[in-house]
C-alpha cells in the first residue's frame, strides 16, 4: 500500500492541507489504543468530528516528536536486526526433517516433520537462502557474505562440513541445487546467476548477468527458472547434461513485479509454470485511487519446442488473496492444483485445472493467515510455510483435511527480539490490507497493500504515471523515513504524523469508506498472534501504530560494508570528490532537515562502515538539477542516497540504469550542478572516467 506513501509523495497528491502540529507530550500507549471508540459510538456533528480529528493529529505529532527527541539516529538498528526472528525459507532434508532460514536471527535451523526446532546454527552475514543437494548436503547463503556454508546431517544434527568462497560477490539472495553436486546462486547486488561446482578447483564455473532484482531460482529437470523482480520477468534457461546453464529457452515479461513462481515438468516433457505477481497492467492513478494493482496468478505452458504461452490468469485480489509470494504447484494423474496464500491478506486459495488447458481453474477458498513468504509440500500431504509477519512456521493440514486450521509454531530469537505490539500492528498495516480493508477489485479499482509496489519496503522497478500533468516517477523505498523529512519528492508531508493520516485516506480512496475508521479485532483473529487483544482499534491507534513501525523500519545493513572499517584508495578519492561536488545538497546528515546533524568528513568512515549506515545523504531543500519533469514548482526535494544501490531505476524519473550512468551524466562548475539536461556551457565540466568510477565506488557504500 505504501504505494500510497511512495506514490502520493512522489506523485504529489496533496490530500489534506499541510498543518504545523503542536509538540506536546505523547499520550500513553493504552490510551492511544483505546482512543475514539466512545466518540465513534456516539453521534457527533461534523464540527465535533473535525475537532476530534485535529486533536488526535496533535497527539500523534506529539508522540512522534517525543520519540524523535529520545532517538539516537546514529544507532537506530537496521530493520533486518530489529523485527524478530523472521522465518523466511524452507527446504526438505529427508522424509522426517526440514531445514529453514531465520532471516532476522541470521540462523539455519533443523526442524522435525512437525516444524519443531531441533537445532539452531548462527550464520554470519544475514542468512537468507538454503538448498539441499541430491546427496543430502545442506548449503546456506547470506545476503552480506561472499561464502556459502556447507553442513552434513548425521541423522540427529547438522555438522559443519566446510565453506565455499565466492570472491567478488557481496552476497547471495537465492540458491538451488543442480545435478552432479552443482549449485546455482543469485547475487542480488551484481544481478548475476552463478553456476558453482563446490568440488572443482575453480568453483565458479560461470557468472552470468541476468538482470535486475533476482530473487529466486529453481531447477526443474533440465531447466532452470529465475525470477527477476525489478525486471518484471521470469526466465527459463536450458541446462546441459553436466548441469551447465545454456541458452535462454523462454521469458515471461509483465508490466509489474512477479513475486514468486513454481514449476513442474509434465509427463510429455512440457513445463507448467505458475507465477504470482501484480496485475499485468500499468498502474493507473488518473482517477485518484491506485488502479490496476490487484494481485494475480498466471499459468503458462512451455512445450518441448516453440515458445511459451499463457493458459490463463486469475485475479486473486478479488478472491481475498493479496501479494502472494509462494505459489505451490501440484501435478498428479493428469490434473493440476495450485495453492496460493497471501502475504498481505488472510485467505488462501486452491485452484484446480487441467495442466494443458486454457479453461478457467476451479477455485476453492479458505480462511488462512497473512505473512506467507515460502511454502513447501511435505510427503504427508501437509504444507509447511514460513511466515515472517507472524514470526512463525505454519503447518497446513493435507488437502481434504481442512477441519483444523493451520498449526502456528512461533519462533523467537534473543538477538532479534520481537518488536513492541504497537509496532507489530503497524507492520501489519503496512504489509496487509488492514489500512484499506474495504477496497474492492471492481473495474480498475484494486485491493492491495503497501508491498504491492514496495517489495519488502524497497521498490518494484516501475516508472509510473502519477495522474498529474506529464509526471512519471520511479518508485521510492519506504525504509528510513524517520530521519528523512519532509517526506517524499514533493516534500508536502512534514512528518510521519502527517504521512500516516494521508496514507489512510489515499489507500482507501475509491472505496467510499471514511478513512477515519476503527477495526474490530474479531474480524482479524490473527492479530492476537501479534499481541493485539483490544476488541476495537480506533483510528488514532491505527495511525500511531503505523508511525511506530515506520520509525523503526530502517534500511538493512549494506552488504558492501560488512566486515570492513575503512575506504579503499578508490573509495577515498570518491569520498573527496563527493564532498566537493555533491555534499552541499546530499549532505552527510543524520537527520535530513537538521543541518546541525551533519557529520564532519573525518567521521564519515565510522558512520558508513557501521551496521546502521545511518547517514541520510540528503537535505530538506528543493533543487532543479535537470531531472524533469519536476514534481513541484520549486523542483524536487533532494532525495536520500542512503542505500542508493538498492534502488533501481535511478533518478526521480527513473532515467538512469546504473549508478555510474547517473554519475557520468553530471555537469557542474563552482556554483551549479546538473544531473541531466545541462545547458551548453563551456564552463561546465563532467567527472573524468576515473573520477566517475571513484564516485560510483563511494556511492555503493552508502
Residue positions per predicted region:
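Periplasmic c-type cytochrome electron-transfer domains
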Residues: 151, 232-233, 237, 246, ...
